Amino acid sequence: MASISYDGLLRGAAKDIQTLTEASLVHGYFNLELDCPEGKQLREDVLFLESFTKEIFDTPSPQKTIYDFKKLGRFRTTGFKPLGIEEGAKGKSDGFEMFMLPQNELLLPSHQDKLQSPSAVFSHRATLTRCMSNYDAASQLILRRITESLNLDNALLAAHNPSEPSVTNLGFLRYPPQPATSENCGHIAHTDVGTLTILAATQRGLQVINSETQDWTFVDPHPQNEFLLVQFGDCLKFLSGGRVVPSIHRVIPSDNPEEREGTKYTLAYFVRPNEEAVIKDDRGEEWVYGDYHCRKFGAFARPLKEGDRDRMPDRPVGEYDMINIRKFKGLADGVSAA
C-alpha cells in the first residue's frame, strides 16, 4: 500500500504529491506516515483515544440506552450503536458496537453547549477536543493537496469550511470475538458516505479492494501508530467531478486465529461535508449534503432482500458483491479505475 509522508504533504514535496494523486485516481486509499511534529501529536492522540475507547464502552447499559445514536439527531453522529442491529459481512448481522462523538459540539463555539454524551466524555472533554482539532488539521491538509494536485476548483474546500457546521464525527468501534459459529460478522462491504475516513485499528479485519488483483486484501494495522490509514469516500468522488476513486471496503474476522479470539478496537475519523453543502451524485442529481447523508445511512439500516443484490453503489453485499464492485469501479471489462 502506498505511504505518504505527513511532513511531505506539509512541505508540498513532489514525491508525496504524486503518490497522493495516484492514490486518488487509482487506489482510493493510502497510509499517512506520522513523521513530523504534527504527526507525532496525532500518534499521542491515538494512544489516548485507544484507552478512552475501553473506558467509554464500560458505560453501563442503561446509560448506553439513554445515549442511543438514533435518539440524538437526524445525522446519527453522536451516541452508541448497539451490536448486531445492521447487516454485516457474509450474510450475518454486523459484528461491532460503536460510540460516536460529533465534531460540531467539540470545535464550534456555537454548538459546544449542545453536546449530549456520558460523563466520561465530559471528564476528558479538553483532551478529546484537542484530538478532534488535530484530526481536522490533517484532513484539511489532505483536501487542500488533493485540490491542488488534481487542479480542482474550490468546491471541495468550500464544502468543508471548518467554521460551518458539518456532519464530521469521530467513531470508536469495538468488535467482540467472532468465531465461525457467531451470528455476527464484521461490517458489510460499502463505500463511506463522506469524504475521508482516517483509521487506526488494533488487529486485522479491514479489507479493501486491491487495484491490481481486483479482489479483497487485508490491511495490516500499525501497533505503534506510526501510520494511519486514509480512505476516500463518496463525497470526494462527487466533489472532484468523478475523478477520485472511493474505497470499497468491508470488515471480517482476522485471518489470524489468535486475533479472532480477542476483541478488536478501531478508531475512525469520518470527514464529511458541511451540513448545507451542495453535492452532485453519480446521476447528476444535486443534494444538500445533510439530506444525502441521511439517505445513505437509511440504506444501511434497511433489511436487505435477496432481490436487492445488485443495488450498487448504495450497498454492495458480502459474498455477492465482487461482480457489482467491478462494475461500479468500471473494471468489469478491464477498464482502468483512473
UniProtKB/Swiss-Prot annotation:
Pfam family membership, one: 2OG-FeII_Oxy
InterPro entries per record: IPNS-like_FE2OG_OXY, IPNS-like_sf, Iron_ascorbate_oxido_reductase, Oxoglu/Fe-dep_dioxygenase_dom
Molecular function terms from GO: metal ion binding; oxidoreductase activity
Keyword Transmembrane helix among UniProt keywords: no
Enzyme Commission number: 1.14.-.-
Alphabetized Gene3D superfamilies for the sequence: B-lactam Antibiotic, Isopenicillin N Synthase, Chain
Use in biotechnology or industry: Due to their effectiveness as antifungal agents, echinocandin derivatives can be used for the treatment of human invasive candidiasis.
Keywords attached to this entry: Iron, Metal-binding, Oxidoreductase
Entry's cofactor comment: Binds 1 Fe(2+) ion per subunit.
Protein family per UniProt: Belongs to the iron/ascorbate-dependent oxidoreductase family.
Job of this protein: 2-oxoglutarate-dependent dioxygenase; part of the gene cluster that mediates the biosynthesis of echinocandin B, a fungal lipidated cyclic hexapeptide that acts as an antifungal agent. Linoleoyl-AMP, produced by the fatty-acyl-AMP ligase ecdI, is transferred to the initiation carrier domain (T0) of ecdA. The linoleoyl-S-phosphopantetheinyl-T0 is sequentially extended with L-ornithine, L-threonine, L-proline, L-homotyrosine, L-threonine, and 4R-methyl-L-proline to form the linear hexapeptide.
Protein name per the record: 2-oxoglutarate-dependent dioxygenase ecdG
Naturally occurring in which organism (per UniProt): Aspergillus rugulosus (Emericella rugulosa)
Gene: ecdG
